[in-house]
Amino acid sequence: QIRTKLSKLGGTDWSRAKTKARAAAKDLAKGLIALYAERQRRPGFAFSPDSPWQKEFEEAFDYEETDDQLRAIAEIKADMERSTPMDRLLCGDVGYGKTEVALRAVMKCVLDGKQAAILVPTTVLAQQHYATALNRFRSFPVRIEVLSRFKTPAQKKQILQDAAAGKIDLLIGTHSLLQKSLHFKDLGLLIIDEEQRFGATHK
C-alpha cells in the first residue's frame, strides 16, 4: 500500500515540491531537445538494399502479409536505408503482425553485420518474443539470446560478454537491457515493444 505524504495547509512544502518538479521537468526537456538535435546532426548507418537472404527470410513467413504490414515493412526499410537515424512508431491492434514487421527489420540489420535489440516491459513478453524469434530464424545463422531474471548470474555474465564481443546478433530483454554494464560491439537497431510502458528517460 502506497502512503502519500500530504503537505500542511499554509505551509511551504507544497510550493517547494512544485518548484522542484518544474525544475526536474525543464532539465528533462532540455536533455531530450539536445538528444534529438544530436540525432539530426550526427549521420547514422545507411543499411544496404535487400539481399537474397532477406528475400528468402521473408518468403519463409507462414502467412500472407496484410496490406498494412507490407506498407509498414516498406516504410521501415526505406528509413533504414537512409543515413538519418530512424525513429519510427509502429501502431497496430493485437494480431496485426507487428512482431513479423520487427523481425524483418532485425534481419535487415543483422545481414549488414550489425546487432539488434528488442526491449520489452515484462519477462513473459521477453520469453514470448524469444520463442518466436528462435522459430522464425531457425533456418538462418542468427544467434539470439534473452536477458531476464530467469537467467543465472553466470548466464547473465556470459551474455554481457558475448554482446560486447559481437557474438550475439539479437538480444531480447526487459529493463536489464538498460543496465550500464551492457555494451554492444555494434548495435544497429533498437526496437521497443509497448513503448508507452517505458519512461522518457529510459527511452
Residue ranges of each PLM-predicted region?
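Conserved ATPase-coupling elements of RecA-like P-loop NTPase cores
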Residues: A102, H129-Y130, Q179-K185, E195-K203
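Pre-Walker A (Motif I) flank of P-loop NTPase domains
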Residues: E81-G92, E100, G113-Q115, I168
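Conserved motor-coupling elements within RecA-like helicase/translocase cores
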Residues: F150-L171, L178-L187
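Walker B catalytic acidic pair
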Residues: T174, D193-E194
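Upstream accessory/linker segments immediately N-terminal to the RecA-like ATPase cores of bacterial MutS
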Residues: Q1-L70
